């Protein structure tokens, strides 16, 4: 059955009209219209088997993939395949077969027909752990109606504009305290500046931020002495990501049956995540229950448990997922942003000028200030273009769909190669350049279905608004207080560790920035 039960020609005509754009030359593959995959064709669609592919034997493909050490370089693997096969190809690795696309117009058509309850690829070891140990799942792993029920409730509490306003003071104080952390480091080094790798500090900042929003209270992760139990949660999240990678292309049950170290470490990581999240949830909730009046927003947990729209087990599962998803992801993006600002000092000065002007105009109103920093917000989009957290976005087709004259059957996994798209000159001019202005002004006409750092549609990242606000406030305070430079001018590569991250520590220099009081 074709998308939404329409006739093939009807689907192609109606599906392509809103998305058409001028033809564009794509390096490494034949000249095509940017919207050609979504366009009407008078030809009969070609069969799925004719989509360019390295071969149908998934195990041979997987052997070659491992032999080329593709596991940590899967984003480069995608880039090479698009250069070799063109803007659409299919690949089977082990038992998993996917169709990969890169053109924004094809992406637009994919999402147009994703259906009311989109289904994405679930990480196999995560599913195996939750099923084997009978752990409750939230929106991360739920499907269909169960997913939609949870998601609609969460949208009200974590995505709606009114909810976001409640988070501003909670996240702003954490960002202010991070400035204090850097000033302590400067004082400790005694050289008038701080030089070093702040990756661990960013992990703690991100965890302090997400816990403050969820529980309405601080954990003290930015104090000089950090609670070792809280640090265990941060370490467990990293281990959970790291141990997932070897089990992506082989059945996790094999690792479980043979009790491999990878599986044992993965289980230990998830156990820590669940145990700590349960402890935090219980402790903070009962503290809140004892209070009768609140001077400040009491946090997402209290709101979810208080509105009785979700069972307590569903609330706990979703809180656990938000805690686990709010550490490495945000901290990695901030680390990359600081790196790009340090490499592009002219951009950094443009951002600083905007922030300082916004502070003056807002006159102490943080909410108003957040509306006055479009370039800063664009710089976050630009960071996610160059350094997306996820290497792909995924959707299982609800119905048959025609892309680039190929018939793709229902239930096929289609993956949008986000990293490869962001680096392709066919879709971004000067793709290697950190240029936030490309997302503003006249350039906005060229960003159709290119801003995919948080996903798209009803199944986009549930923590998107929290993360965007958290990063914007963080960068505001950094730009107001420090000039950021690289300690060593060397390129930092990217590796795949379930999320994309730097392949080595990034050493930065923070110099105090003192605004001229006459200009303040």
UniProtKB/Swiss-Prot annotation:
Family label: Belongs to the cytochrome P450 family.
Cofactor: heme
Pathway, per record: Lipid metabolism; C21-steroid hormone metabolism; Steroid metabolism; cholesterol metabolism
InterPro entries cross-referenced by the UniProt entry: CYP11_CYP27_families (IPR050479), Cyt_P450 (IPR001128), Cyt_P450_CS (IPR017972), Cyt_P450_E_grp-I (IPR002401), Cyt_P450_sf (IPR036396)
Chain's gene name: CYP11A1
Domain of life: Eukaryota
Source taxonomy: Eukaryota, Metazoa, Chordata, Craniata, Vertebrata
Pfam families: p450 (PF00067)
Function recorded in the entry: A cytochrome P450 monooxygenase that catalyzes the side-chain hydroxylation and cleavage of cholesterol to pregnenolone, the precursor of most steroid hormones. Catalyzes three sequential oxidation reactions of cholesterol, namely the hydroxylation at C22 followed with the hydroxylation at C20 to yield 20R,22R-hydroxycholesterol that is further cleaved between C20 and C22 to yield the C21-steroid pregnenolone and 4-methylpentanal. Mechanistically, uses molecular oxygen inserting one oxygen atom into a substrate and reducing the second into a water molecule.
Gene3D superfamilies in the record: Cytochrome P450
Protein name as annotated: Cholesterol side-chain cleavage enzyme, mitochondrial
Source organism: Sus scrofa (Pig)
Membrane topology: Peripheral membrane protein
